[in-house]
Amino acid sequence: MARIAGVNIPTNKRVLIALQYIHGIGQKSAREIITKVGIEDARRVNQLTDAEVLQIRETIDRDYTVEGDLRRENSMNIKRLMDLACYRGLRHRKGLPVRGQRTHTNARTRKGPAKPIAGKKK
């Protein structure tokens, strides 16, 4: 089992699919990585040599923000919006939808479970 960017990559899967187990690498990024390193699509992780795994690791470290760094960057961006007290920051603070969705009905995922109101029975 290869370990890249702090993540154990599954050995029996194709390299293109296995790289997507790393947070911050999707299908497009994985394809770019294997093209840069020169690995064909059909290869599986258990068929990679140590040198190829090292090349993949170096490419990811050099060109991509992944895992903990990406999560930290995202949370810092949200914290910055909240500190600025701009509209988006206030919506994040209140736990409401940020991108203009309606809240009179719906938005239950963001707002949490419905709170019962006294005297509202039929």
Curated annotation (Swiss-Prot):
SUPFAM superfamilies in the record: S13-like H2TH domain
Q: Which InterPro entries is this protein grouped with?
A: Rbsml_uS13_C, Ribosomal_uS13, Ribosomal_uS13-like_H2TH, Ribosomal_uS13_bac-type, Ribosomal_uS13_CS
**Which Gene3D superfamilies does this chain map to?**
1.10.8.50, 30s ribosomal protein s13, domain 2 (4.10.910.10)
**Pfam families associated with the record:** Ribosomal_S13 (PF00416)
Segments forming a coiled coil: none
One Gene Ontology term of the biological-process aspect is: translation
Asked whether the UniProt record includes tRNA-binding among its keywords, one would answer yes
Q: Where is the signal peptide?
A: none
Q: Where is this region: Disordered?
A: 95-122
> Which controlled-vocabulary keywords does the entry list?
Ribonucleoprotein, Ribosomal protein, RNA-binding, rRNA-binding, tRNA-binding
- Taxonomically, the superkingdom here is Bacteria
- Segments spanning the bilayer are none
Record carries keyword Lipoprotein: no
Q: Name one GO molecular function term.
A: structural constituent of ribosome
Please give the GO cellular component terms listed in this UniProt entry: cytosol; small ribosomal subunit
| Subunit-structure text | Part of the 30S ribosomal subunit. Forms a loose heterodimer with protein S19. Forms two bridges to the 50S subunit in the 70S ribosome.
Q: What does this protein do?
A: Located at the top of the head of the 30S subunit, it contacts several helices of the 16S rRNA. In the 70S ribosome it contacts the 23S rRNA (bridge B1a) and protein L5 of the 50S subunit (bridge B1b), connecting the 2 subunits; these bridges are implicated in subunit movement. Contacts the tRNAs in the A and P-sites.
User: Which HAMAP family does the UniProt entry name for this protein?
Assistant: Ribosomal_uS13 (MF_01315)
**Similarity comment: family membership:** Belongs to the universal ribosomal protein uS13 family.
* Protein's name according to its UniProt entry: Small ribosomal subunit protein uS13
**Per the UniProt entry, what species is this protein from, by scientific name?**
Caulobacter vibrioides (strain NA1000 / CB15N) (Caulobacter crescentus)
